[in-house]
A protein has these predicted regions:
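A charged, aromatic-enriched C-terminal amphipathic alpha-helix characteristic of glycosyltransferases
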Residues: 100-103, 117-160
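Acidic donor-binding loop of glycosyltransferase active sites
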Residues: 49-61, 74
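Nucleotide-activated donor-binding/catalytic signature segment of Leloir-type glycosyltransferases, i.e.
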Residues: 22-43
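Short alpha-helical segment that forms part of, or immediately flanks, the ligand-binding pocket
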Residues: 45, 67-71, 85-86, 92
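Short hydrophobic beta-strand element within catalytic cores of glycosyltransferases
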Residues: 75-80, 88
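Conserved acidic donor-binding segment of nucleotide-sugar-dependent glycosyltransferases
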Residues: 37, 90-91, 95-103, 110-117
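Short hydrophobic signal-anchor/transmembrane segments that target glycosyltransferases
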Residues: 1-12, 18-24
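Short alpha-helical donor nucleotide-sugar binding micro-motif in glycosyltransferases
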Residues: 46-51, 69, 141
Length: 160
């Protein structure tokens, strides 16, 4: 992502967080890239709510950060592998790139910007994020357990 934005000096990138390679990334970053380090949740949320897009280049089984961005109404430009395929709805809440290369990221950013000023609906992103909410998870688990218990009780003539 850093390399891609170095090749797009007219575009701004804010990096929040840290990690073992942070100093290396800072040294290679151009003036259009701002490193903010670790931030409290309120600052992270505010930045996500005002971002054009959230770029997610990690290949994770299930990354929560894209869902957090979507819950702020922010579309995701994400790697089209792993959990992003579940957490990002292409064309609805964001778009994908399929290689972890600066060129693929640049292409995705340019495709995103070619869609216009507000290419993804804030409300659609937020609604999609609700699919992954704790409340929905609890409700569906409870329903699943109750259904299986009822089936088992019926099949084994168990009454309470």
């Amino acid at each position: 992502v850093i390399e891609a934005f170095n090749k797009m000096p007219d575009k701004r990138l804010f990096v929040i967080g840290g990690g073992p390679n942070l100093e290396k990334y800072k040294k290679m970053a151009g003036s259009n890239i701002t490193f903010m380090g670790y931030q409290p949740f309120a600052v992270l949320k505010e930045k996500m709510q005002h971002a054009k897009a959230f770029i997610f280049a990690a290949d994770e089984d299930f990354g929560m950060i894209p869902v957090e961005a979507e819950s702020c109404g922010t579309p995701v430009i994400g790697l089209g592998h792993g959990g992003s395929l579940e957490t990002v709805s292409e064309g609805e809440t964001g778009l994908f790139f399929y290689e972890q290369t600066p060129e693929a990221i640049m292409d995705a950013v340019n495709r995103f910007e070619s869609l216009g000023e507000m290419p993804f609906d804030y409300h659609v992103c937020r609604k999609w994020a609700e699919v992954f909410s704790e409340e929905r998870f609890k409700k569906e688990i409870r329903l699943f357990v109750e259904t299986k218990y009822a089936e088992f009780s019926y099949n084994h003539n168990i009454t309470i």
